[in-house]
Every structure is written in C-alpha cells, then in structure tokens.
Swiss-Prot record:
It comes from the Viruses. This is Serine/threonine-protein kinase UL13 homolog. It catalyses: L-seryl-[protein] + ATP = O-phospho-L-seryl-[protein] + ADP + H(+); L-threonyl-[protein] + ATP = O-phospho-L-threonyl-[protein] + ADP + H(+). Keywords: ATP-binding, Host nucleus, Kinase, Nucleotide-binding, Serine/threonine-protein kinase, Transferase, Virion, Virion tegument. ATP binds at A151, G152, S153, G154, S155, Y156, G157, V158, V159, K170. It is an enzyme of class 2 (transferase). Residues 10-23 have a biased composition (Polar residues). It comes from Gallid herpesvirus 2 (strain Chicken/Md5/ATCC VR-987). Multifunctional serine/threonine kinase that plays a role in several processes including egress of virus particles from the nucleus, modulation of the actin cytoskeleton and regulation of viral and cellular gene expression. Pfam families: Pkinase. Residues 145-487 form the Protein kinase domain.
Length: 513
C-alpha cells in the first residue's frame, strides 16, 4: 500500500484528524525500533489498558478494521493511546537526529579547508548516486571588513581579491550552476590528490554562494601569464628554471590525476588559468602553482558519477539540487577545439577534415582527455620558455603559435593550416631527441605526416604554401636559436607534453619514477 493511501486511511479513521502528525506515516526503521522496544518493556500502557502488539502494527500500517477497533477499549482510551505513540515517536526521532554544525549565513572570515566537499548520501540505483554537499561551504553573502581589489574580468565574470583575508572571489555571470558543479567535483579531487599522492596543484574550493553566484578560492600572487612576462624583464638564474621545471612536472601529475583517477578533463589549460605564488623580492622564484577555472571541464569515461545528483542545503527548509546533465558529459567539438592556440594538431586536422564529434554521443575517454590537457600544459610551458628563456639572444620573444587576432579570432581553415605549418617549422629546432622523447617516435610534428592526413587537396596546397612562406621568413631566425644548457630539461619536458604521438604525452617514465 503506498504512502498516500496509508495517510488517507489514517485520517479518515477519525483519530486526531486535526493534528499535523495524523497524516504522516512513520519511518519504517522508527516503527521497528518502537515496536520491539514496547514489546520488551511492557504489555500495558501507563493508563492501565492492556495493549495487543498486533494493534501497534495495525496502527503503523494504517489499517484500522472496524471489528478490531474494540480491542483498544473506548474512544477515550484510543485517543490517549494514540497521543502516547506520537510522544514516543517524537522522542525516538530526537534521539536519532544528530545536532547539525552551526554555520553562519555570512562569510565573515577566511573559510578553512574542508575535509570533504561532498559525501555520499544514498545510492538510488546501480549508476545513480545522491551526494550531500558540505553545508559549511555555502554562505548567503560576504561581510568582510575590507574593500576588495579588482583582479580581472571577462566572459566568465569578475574576480576580486580580499588581501587581508587572503581569498579570491569569482562572481560568475553565466552558467553558474554548471561551473559550480564542475568546481565542486574538482574541489573534491583536489582534496583526494593532496591526501593520497600529496599533489597540491589543483585549486581547492573554500566556499560558494548560490544566491550571489560566487565561488571562493585561496588568493594567489598572480597567474602564469603575468609571471612569465615579469620573468622576461629580470635577471634569471638556474634556480628560476629549476623551480619552473618542478612546477610543470607537478602540474603534469595533477593533470593525469584529474583525467585518470577523477575522470575530469579540464579542456582549458593555459597560462591564464594557472595561478602561482612566488618569493618576495625583485627576482621572484616560483613557489607553487595550481590549475584553476573548471568552467569548460567535462567528465570522461573514467568518471563514476556520470548520473549523479548533488544536494546543497541552502537553508533549513530549502535544498538546491545540481544534476550531472548531458552538457557535463558529451563533448562539443567547437568547445574542445576552442581558440586552437593550445590544442593538439590531431584536433585541428579533424576540424579541417570536417570530422569532429558530430555523431558522437559518448564522453571523452581518459586517454583522449590526457592527450588534450597535457598538450595544452606543454603549450603553456612553451610560452614560458620562448618568452622568458629565448630572449637572451633576441630582444623580442618568439611566439609559440601564429597570432589569433590576425584572423579576427575566427577558427578559419587558413588559421588552422597556419598553426600546423608553424609548429612543423619551429618544433624541430626546439625539441630534443633523447631516449625519453624518442621512445614513441619523433617528438615534433612532421609536414609529410600532416599532409597525408589532410583529405582536401586544397588544404594540402595551402599547407604547402604556408610552409614555403615560413621557410623564407623564419628559417634563419630558427637556425640561429641558441639553446642554453639549463633549458634542456625544460625542452625535454615540453617535447613529451607536446609529443606528436598522443601516447607519449602522459610522460610516465619522467613523472612517476
């Protein structure tokens, strides 16, 4: 018998129909506990009326048969007995409830790092899980006794820094729930990475506000983009490059952990989304770095929460649910390709051939996620090397890719062919041939291999024209590059991350041995 029919029959029975508890079916576990406790303790109630144990069961099931009602005695005893049951049930419920940790609706200080971002509440079925988000993470509004400093803005929203409190608050303008969901998952991954593998290179989530559409993170000194521009203007030592090498190796471990262990592919790794802390002084050295901004992240095939729901306790009587939807799983090719500056060449070839992900309904595999994210991380490392490391011999920095604004920031075929030709010309002068980089083939992109993969004869002809143009304009420049010894390890790492063979990009032998 369903709950509605139970409640209906109990109310129609005429017992305390005006009481708010009369239409409520007790929880089964409470029913069993109360029934066993009453049977063990006594057979008569405090009014001296003998109670049949089967009458308890009939009350809980809501089946009040007319012939059996007389076992309770007169109606006066029935009402007092029903009140006694409800009183005992209230006591059991009070004992069962654990006192909730008090939390303030205002954010008045820097939140501490939580033990868990969310915990498993129940399993709905084999593939669907219900999680409870830690209630202490949510706040209604900020009430800090300081004025924030504007840090930046864009299509994503606005970021402000509270220096005294040492937090960064990101106000999301569009698609807040999607970014919140991915940030919650990434925040839990950050805690797992720190506790299991001591990886501290995923930005942790400190708090969030659904009414204000805000995310709270630890504050960092700057992003990697600002750091390498600053690095290009100072006197660098070997310690600077060793710190950069260690930082990008740790970031590589974090990327592999996100894709393989957490089933989360970032899809937007770049210098602007890597946040760093540096030492004080005129020649700052990298101390640590984290990967942030999971607004474009997707769950891949290694994820175990593809059909999950996350419940956020906003107030005592309001719960906001965040569900993993199709947009968090299915890759959209245009979003994966992005602006093309940090994406691997195989994605550009797919775009030129018109293949993409149009007929694909499954998530990205973890191997695809690793190859995309590691290549983007390698492109970020290449920007640092070329802008801050190669300006010893040249007064200007060498670009790692053709400039996007020349093509009005549109993903046109000539722009993609330009990138492919430029990488074929540049990387053969930078990437070293070592036992690590050559284990899975030649590390740089080769023109003859790309030419064979292009389906259109027009694209092949335009690709050859770009190669000829770069041979005229950039050959002497690239031949004159002088690679300093302290850059060899960094270039080897970049060659692995940006390897022409996607299998080599995990850099297993280098990162985990």
């Amino acid at each position: 018998m369903d709950t509605e029919s139970k409640n209906k029959k109990t109310t129609n029975g005429g017992e305390n129909s005006n009481c708010s508890h009369s239409t409520r079916t007790p929880d089964k576990s409470i029913e069993e506990r109360f029934y066993n406790w009453e049977r063990r303790s006594r057979t008569t109630n405090r009014f001296g009326t003998t109670v049949n144990s089967r009458s308890y069961n009939m009350y809980f099931q809501g089946t009040h048969n007319t012939s059996r009602r007389h076992t309770y005695g007169n109606i006066h005893h029935r009402r007092r007995f029903s009140d006694n049951i409800r009183r005992c049930l209230r006591q059991l419920c009070m004992k069962r409830k654990t006192p909730a940790k008090k939390r303030s609706d205002k954010l008045v200080s820097r939140p501490s790092l939580p033990e868990h971002v969310f915990t498993l509440a129940r399993i709905k079925n084999v593939t669907t899980f219900i999680f409870n988000v830690t209630s202490e993470l949510h706040y209604s509004h900020i009430d800090l006794k300081e004025m924030p400093i504007y840090a930046g803005s864009g299509s994503y929203g606005v970021v402000k820094i509270f220096k005294k409190t040492d937090i960064a608050v990101k106000k999301v303008l569009e698609c807040f729930k999607t970014e919140l969901l991915m940030t919650l998952i990434a925040g839990e991954c950050a805690l797992r990475a720190k506790s299991t593998l001591r990886i501290n290179n995923i930005i942790p989530l400190l708090a969030f506000s659904i009414p204000s559409k805000e995310l709270v993170f630890p504050a960092y000194h700057m992003d990697m983009d600002s750091y390498y521009h600053r690095l290009a203007r100072i006197d660098k030592t070997v310690q600077h490059w060793k710190a950069i090498e260690k930082t990008f190796m740790d970031l590589g471990k974090a990327v592999v952990f996100l894709n393989v262990s957490c089933g989360l592919t970032h899809l937007d790794i770049k210098c602007g989304n890597i946040f760093v802390n540096v030492t004080e002084g005129p020649n700052p050295i990298l101390v640590d770095a984290v990967i942030g901004d999971f607004s474009l992240a997707l769950l891949n095939t290694n994820s175990t929460i593809l059909k999950s729901r996350f419940d956020v306790n906003i107030s005592s009587d309001k719960i906001q649910s965040l569900k993993v939807c199709r947009g968090n799983i299915k890759p959209v090719f245009d979003l994966v390709l992005g602006h093309g500056q940090t994406q691997p060449c195989e994605l550009m070839i797919k775009a030129l051939n018109g293949v993409g992900f149009e007929r694909r309904s499954t998530p990205l595999t973890s191997d695809e996620g690793v190859s995309i994210d590691m290549y983007a991380l390698g492109q970020s490392l290449m920007e640092v090397i070329l802008a801050a490391g190669m300006n010893f011999t040249h007064r200007f920095g060498i670009s790692s890719n053709p400039l996007h604004f020349y093509y009005h920031r549109l993903m046109r075929a000539d722009y993609l062919l330009d990138i492919l030709a430029y990488r074929c010309m540049l990387y053969q002068h930078l990437f070293p041939m070592t036992p690590l980089t050559s284990k899975n083939g030649i590390p740089w992109e080769r023109a003859e291999k790309i030419r064979l993969q292009l389906h259109s004869s027009r694209h092949r002809a335009e690709f050859d024209k770009y190669l000829e143009a770069y041979d005229i304009t950039h050959r002497k420049l690239f031949d004159s590059l002088n690679i300093f010894p302290y850059l060899n390890n960094l270039l080897e790492l970049a060659a692995l991350y940006c390897h022409a063979n996607p299998v080599a990009r995990t850099a297993d032998l280098l990162l985990w041995n």
